[in-house]
């Protein structure tokens, strides 16, 4: 996460998760480019990797490394969570390329 609005998005997610029975870790890894921002263990003990993004207009600014990570991990519990105004949209990893190209005009699955 590189910009203040994404940091604010993370803080709001962290606040919301604090009242759940999930376990989460924010990943800050500059050595493995494209690694998602959040590792989440849900109440069913399944892990999820989640990239957090804030839309700029309709655009979702995913780096080529982030898209590549999603493409490599499609079919897994890897996601892109996008905030646009008051809406929060959850996209599967296999939608990353289309999300990069179409932005939030793309329908989440």
Q: Model-derived features: where do they sit?
A:
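Acidic-basic catalytic patches of nuclease active cores, encompassing PD-(D/E)XK
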Residues: 1-29, 43
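Mg2+/Mn2+-dependent nuclease catalytic core
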Residues: 56-73
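Conserved catalytic cores of phosphodiester-cleaving nucleases, focusing on short active-site segments
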Residues: 38-40, 46-56
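Beta-rich catalytic cores
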Residues: 34
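Nucleic-acid nuclease catalytic cores
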Residues: 73-98
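Helix-rich interaction surfaces within compact, conserved domain-sized segments
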Residues: 96-109
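Short, flexible beta-strand-to-coil junctions
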Residues: 43-44, 55, 82-87
């Amino acid at each position: 996460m590189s910009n203040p609005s994404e940091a604010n998005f993370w803080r709001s997610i962290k606040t919301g998760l604090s009242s759940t029975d999930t376990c989460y870790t924010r990943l800050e890894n500059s050595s493995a480019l494209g690694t998602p921002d959040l590792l989440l263990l849900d109440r069913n003990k399944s892990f999820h990797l989640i990239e957090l993004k804030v839309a700029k207009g309709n655009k979702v600014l995913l780096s080529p490394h982030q898209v590549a990570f999603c493409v490599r991990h499609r079919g897994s519990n890897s996601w892109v969570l996008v905030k646009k105004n008051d809406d929060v949209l959850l996209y599967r990893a296999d939608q990353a390329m289309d999300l990069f190209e179409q932005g939030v005009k793309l329908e989440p699955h």
